């Protein structure tokens, strides 16, 4: 896709990257021609104009080394968060074709959660490959793996072996059910984990079935994000003089933790275990989405009375003619009034009507639209790298900004460089090549 207000960097401003190799000119979504490129507030612009920024020399986690074992879903997302913050991530990939690893775009990897890595290809069924993996682990601060419990132990790479060789190591383990328990060895996916957590039962319309919330709650929010948080906390402990340890991140527990506020509301008698009957699940007519006259949608959430009043004014409705906002018996009438009002104009017209207000109303944007929205454009919230529009690293650090994201590597693409940077000498790397292990330049 194309995005508006793009600045095409001069090729001299691209990256001749000594770490990743190759030249990477790029474009970034910015706020327009009149923006002050030196004001330091638009992080997307800073990313675009950095000239001397080796990918692993920037970011708040610069200097932290991570060994990631190839996986799908939450573990790569958690590792992406660390890599976006500047960690030096070496991913150990299986010896398969790059096309087997993820989506492609014009010959380049379009797997955004795989960005900012370097790849070493190892066949972990071979003792020589396991030996290389252990050498990397000895040099690492963090290991991330997302296999079923017991897999790493069977490979000879489990935490007991790893921590014996590197006592300061943080060993992150990402699973659905956790490392222990009667279901630990069972297969599953995001939807299964959030079903068992209790969260899925609360998502969906009144009288309808539970609805999958994409794979955001289990895989990413309750999985990879909490894995990264746990790893960072364990790193702080090590830097304070503590020992390395295992971080057991289970999506069932992570998803349940994301629902902590709901558990509190339930305990306080303010939540019904009936979908679509509560304030935050679409039960309240003033916390829901409404169709507009052109078949698009607006999202409304004016919980506070002062915001609610502004919304009514802009909708052309009078509070005096409607049931009280918090009178549940009147919610059906409120929903009818809001439905009729929003159908009276297009989404664009409603956007213009609510512009600048505190009514807590926003358009429901598609992904491509989100990258073009003026607010995101002004902040540089999206960036285009090798033809792939994607979110910039978040959160943003104003004192130690993240480097320009690099696309996910092909298998073994930068293995030789990664091994050299991690202390393997040229002779050792050449011996590994002779053994048939797949390293790139």
Model-identified regions with their sequence ranges:
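An anion-binding loop in the catalytic cleft
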Residues: 292-296, 337, 347-348, 393-441
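Aromatic-enriched alpha-helical interface/lid elements that frame and gate functional surfaces
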Residues: 281, 285-357, 361
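N-terminal helix-loop segment corresponding to the beta1-alpha1 unit
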Residues: 37, 49-240, 410, 416-441
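Oxidoreductase and adenylate-handling cofactor-binding alpha/beta cores
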Residues: 197, 223-244, 257, 261-269, ...
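Conserved Rossmann-fold dehydrogenase catalytic segment
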Residues: 179, 208-218, 239-255, 275-282, ...
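A glycine-rich dinucleotide-binding beta-alpha-beta segment and adjacent secondary-structure elements
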Residues: 355-405
């Amino acid at each position: 896709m194309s995005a508006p207000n793009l600045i095409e960097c001069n090729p001299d401003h691209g990256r001749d990257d000594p770490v990743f190799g190759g030249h990477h000119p790029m474009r970034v979504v910015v706020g327009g021609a009149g923006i002050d490129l030196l004001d330091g507030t638009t992080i997307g612009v800073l990313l675009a104009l950095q000239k001397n920024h080796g990918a692993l020399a920037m970011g708040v986690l610069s200097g932290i080394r991570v060994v990631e074992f190839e996986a799908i879903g939450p573990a790569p997302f958690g590792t992406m968060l660390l890599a976006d913050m500047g960690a030096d991530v070496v991913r150990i990939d299986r010896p398969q074709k790059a096309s087997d690893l993820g989506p492609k775009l014009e010959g380049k990897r379009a797997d955004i959660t795989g960005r900012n890595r370097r790849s070493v290809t190892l066949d972990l069924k071979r003792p020589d490959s396991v030996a290389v993996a252990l050498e990397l682990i000895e040099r690492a601060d963090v290991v991330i793996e997302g296999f079923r419990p017991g897999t790493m132990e069977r490979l000879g790479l489990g935490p007991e072996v790893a921590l014996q060789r590197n006592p300061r190591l943080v060993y992150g383990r990402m699973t659905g059910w956790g490392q222990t328990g009667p279901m630990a060895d069972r297969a599953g996916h995001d939807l299964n984990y959030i079903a068992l957590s209790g969260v899925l039962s609360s998502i969906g319309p009144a009288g309808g079935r539970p609805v999958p919330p994409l794979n955001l709650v289990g895989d990413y929010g309750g999985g990879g994000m909490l894995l990264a948080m746990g790893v960072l906390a364990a790193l702080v402990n090590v830097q304070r003089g503590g020992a390395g340890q295992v971080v057991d991140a289970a999506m069932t527990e992570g998803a349940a933790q994301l629902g902590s506020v709901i558990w509190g509301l339930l305990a306080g008698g303010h939540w019904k275990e009936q979908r679509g009957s509560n304030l935050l699940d679409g039960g309240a007519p003033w916390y829901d989405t409404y169709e507009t006259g052109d078949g698009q949608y607006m999202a409304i959430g004016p919980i506070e009375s002062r915001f609610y009043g502004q919304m009514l004014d802009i909708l052309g409705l009078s509070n005096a003619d409607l049931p009280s906002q918090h009178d549940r018996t009147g919610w059906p009438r409120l929903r009818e009034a809001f439905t009729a009002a929003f159908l009276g104009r297009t989404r664009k017209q409603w956007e213009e009507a609510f512009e600048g207000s505190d009514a807590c109303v926003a358009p429901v944007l598609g992904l491509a639209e989100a990258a073009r929205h003026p607010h995101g454009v002004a902040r540089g919230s999206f960036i285009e790298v090798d033809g792939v529009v994607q979110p910039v690293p978040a959160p943003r650090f104003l004192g130690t900004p993240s480097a320009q994201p690099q696309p996910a590597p092909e298998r073994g693409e930068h293995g030789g460089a990664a091994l050299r940077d991690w202390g393997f000498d040229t002779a050792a790397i050449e011996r590994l090549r002779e053994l048939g292990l797949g390293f790139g330049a």
